[in-house]
From Swiss-Prot:
CC terms in the record's Gene Ontology section: pilus
Keywords: Fimbrium, Plasmid, Signal
Species of origin: Escherichia coli
Protein name stated in the entry: K88 minor fimbrial subunit FaeI
Recorded superkingdom: Bacteria
Keyword Signal recorded: yes
GO BP terms, alphabetized: cell adhesion
Residues of the signal peptide: 1-20
Length: 254
């Protein structure tokens, strides 16, 4: 009986106009109002792969013709991949954390994080008639930032891989926080969000924290770039007329 009494009491608090009928025979007009919060499920990340370079010149030498040594390749700094959020997500949620992976399905591919924010990448080389001709090695740097609001102030943290992907270093080899702003500003060259130019990065978070529901007003950036110089071509035998490498890129959200 107590439950019934409480229920009736709650109902009695509803506006009487909800249950009111109009006077018989009079003209009638009314309005039904519906409202609620809007939660966007649109993924805010956009990505751009670098243009590459098809004019890298390699000079022959006797040792190279015999397949006995590597050939230095003067690489310029080249964009590998840029990513940014174009919308501010009200709170972290599932499906917002990007797992960037390189080299999926490429036989002979390897990526090893050797220094803070720096990786050694090895790709298989194809030569004439798409025949496997050797390997190409270069250095790549990568970093990301997670931005969210806390007590009315923006917080910027460097992100490291905790999704078992290879597009970011682990926590122990993450880029130094003091190096992240300048590095990403150079990579984006004015195409990043406005806060990229003024941010101060403090501390680190796993990239999975983009899905942390306790975070508010979530945004982020990611950048990877080939480091100028340091490329090396290793051939299995005679020098082909042309050599090619490609770096597969894939992104899965978690």
């Amino acid at each position: 009986m107590k439950k019934v009494t409480l229920f009736l009491f709650v109902v009695s608090l509803l506006p009487s106009t909800v249950l009111a009928w109009n006077t018989p025979g009079e003209d009638f007009s009314g309005e039904l109002k519906l409202e609620g919060a809007v939660t966007s499920t649109r993924n805010p990340w956009v990505w751009k792969v670098g243009q590459g370079n098809e004019s890298l010149e390699v000079k022959q030498s006797r040792g190279v013709r015999d397949g006995e040594q590597g050939i230095p390749v003067a690489l310029p700094a080249l964009t590998v991949l840029l990513g940014k959020t174009t919308l501010t997500t009200p709170a972290g949620r599932e499906g917002l954390s990007p797992g960037v992976s390189y080299g999926k399905g490429a036989e002979g591919f390897s990526l090893e994080w050797t220094a803070p924010g720096m990786a050694k990448v090895t790709l298989p080389v194809t030569g004439d008639k798409n025949v496997r001709a050797g390997t190409f090695t270069f250095r790549m740097q990568a970093a990301g930032v997670l931005r969210h609001m806390q007590d009315g102030q923006p917080v910027y943290t460097g992100v490291y891989d905790d999704l078992n992907a290879n597009g970011l270093p682990g926590e122990s080899t993450a880029m130094k926080t003091s190096d992240i702003p300048g590095t990403l500003q150079t990579m984006f060259s004015g195409e990043g969000p406005s806060w990229l130019q003024t941010m101060t990065v403090s501390g680190y978070s796993g990239v999975s924290h983009f899905s942390d529901a306790s975070l508010r007003q979530v945004e982020g950036v990611y950048g990877a770039q080939i480091v100028a110089g340091g490329g090396e071509l290793h051939l299995n035998g005679a020098m082909p007329e042309r050599w090619r490498v490609s770096l597969p890129v894939s992104i899965e959200y978690q």
